Structures are given as structure tokens and as C-alpha cells.
Swiss-Prot record:
Record GO cellular component, one term: plasma membrane
Organism this protein belongs to: Dehalococcoides mccartyi (strain ATCC BAA-2100 / JCM 16839 / KCTC 5957 / BAV1)
Encoding gene, per UniProt annotation: atpC
Function: Produces ATP from ADP in the presence of a proton gradient across the membrane.
Protein name as it appears in the record: ATP synthase epsilon chain
Subcellular location: Cell membrane
Any GO MF annotation of the entry: ATP binding
UniProt cross-references to InterPro entries, sorted A to Z: ATP_F1_dsu/esu_C_sf, ATP_synth_F1_dsu/esu, ATP_synth_F1_dsu/esu_N, ATP_synth_F1_esu_C, ATPsynth_dsu/esu_N
Complexes and interactors: F-type ATPases have 2 components, CF(1) - the catalytic core - and CF(0) - the membrane proton channel. CF(1) has five subunits: alpha(3), beta(3), gamma(1), delta(1), epsilon(1). CF(0) has three main subunits: a, b and c.
Domain of life according to the entry: Bacteria
Bilayer topology annotation: Peripheral membrane protein
Keywords: ATP synthesis, Cell membrane, CF(1), Hydrogen ion transport, Ion transport, Membrane, Transport
């Protein structure tokens, strides 16, 4: 069966590099599944869960922004930030969520700051979702 080489990198490090069967990524226009021999594509990513499947195993990562490049045999993710499920600091994510919710409760937050706060809240919520999923299903 054909495979895809998946490389997920940030400015600081390589987060994931494996041969996979399928990649499910959070594109800016919605979630997309990428299989081997996919047509070439370049798209921006939004904060969300990126899933990589190898056989019956599924790996979950959190990506926040960046770009995804698809070639027939390779997927490269250049993320603003990325972390594997097992790397998520749950206490830190809970605190980030609380801070973002408190900021959003302020009715006088300027437009640009409101957008940044909303993005922070989304990142925290995705991190908590992925961490909780891993806690319930340790193989993820």
C-alpha cells in the first residue's frame, strides 16, 4: 500500500516525521483528508488537531497556524507551533483558556486584540481536547 512521508516542523524543531497512510489536517476552509497520490496543494492552516494514521494507529498533534504543502508522496507542515498529544501541558492549557475567556468577557476589547484573544481561546480548547482524547485512549 502506498504511503505518504509526513514532516511537521516549526521554527524551533522537527515535531513529527513518519511514513503514514493518511493525514487529516485543519485547513482554513475546513478539515481535509490527504491520501497518497493526492494532487499538489498548498494551503494555510488554522489552529486544530492534525491526525496521522499508520495502519490501525492514530497519532494526534495540535498545530497552530502555518502552511501545509501536499505533493503526491509527501506532506510538509510548516507550523507556527505544533506539539504531540503527549507533550501538552494540561495545567498550562487550562490557564490559557481561563485567561482568554476572561479577556473575551471584557466588552471593550479592541478589534485586533479580540481576534488574538479568540485565537488563543481556540488553541487552548484544541490542546485540551487532544490531551483529553489521549488520556481516554493512550494509544493516540
Amino acid at each position: 500500500m502506498a504511503k505518504l512521508k509526513l514532516d511537521i516542523v516549526t521554527a524551533e524543531r522537527s515535531v513529527f516525521s513518519e511514513e503514514v497512510d493518511v493525514v487529516v489536517a485543519p485547513g482554513i476552509e475546513g478539515e481535509m483528508a490527504i491520501l497518497p497520490h493526492h494532487a499538489p496543494l498548498m494551503t494555510a492552516l488554522q489552529a486544530g488537531e492534525l491526525k496521522a494514521k499508520i495502519g490501525t494507529e492514530e497519532y494526534s498533534l495540535v498545530v497552530s497556524g502555518g502552511f501545509l504543502e501536499v505533493r503526491p508522496d509527501r506532506v510538509v507542515v510548516l507550523a507556527d507551533s505544533a506539539e504531540r498529544a503527549e507533550e501538552i501541558d494540561i495545567a498550562r492549557a487550562i490557564e490559557a483558556k481561563k485567561r482568554a475567556e476572561a479577556s473575551m468577557a471584557d466588552k471593550y476589547v479592541p478589534g485586533m486584540l479580540a481576534a488574538e484573544t479568540e485565537a488563543s481561546l481556540r488553541r487552548a480548547m484544541v490542546r485540551l481536547k487532544v490531551a483529553e482524547k489521549r488520556r481516554k485512549h493512550p494509544q493516540v
